[in-house]
Regions:
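N-terminal, polar/charged subdomain of small-to-medium soluble alpha/beta proteins
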Residues: 1-97
Length: 97
């Protein structure tokens, strides 16, 4: 899986990139059919926000997480993405054709 990390109003450090790759590689191990993941780190007024977008089984899946600490926001976004993909996997497999 290719993980694209970008920043908005922030200078990305190697530590931030490593944190994103580390956290979201766990999602990759649970869902090997993912091809690409786009993660955007944003700094606003007093908050740090992480947006993650991907395609899973033909549907767009996106999650957002915000926190005072960027590393906590990254961890929350990874957990939310894993949860959203689990939900989407269950919905796709439970529908009758």
């Amino acid at each position: 899986m290719h993980i694209n990390v970008s920043g908005h109003h922030i200078n990305l450090t190697q530590g931030m990139k490593d944190a994103v790759l580390n956290r979201f590689s766990k999602v990759e191990s649970h869902f090997p059919q993912l091809d690409q993941l786009s993660v955007t780190l944003t700094v606003g007024k007093g908050e740090r926000k992480v947006d993650a977008n991907t395609l899973f089984l033909g549907d767009a899946v996106s999650v957002q997480a915000s926190d005072d600490d960027m590393y906590h926001a990254i961890a929350d976004a990874a957990k939310k993405l894993n949860s959203a993909l689990e939900h989407r996997k269950g919905v796709k497999s439970s529908r009758r054709s």
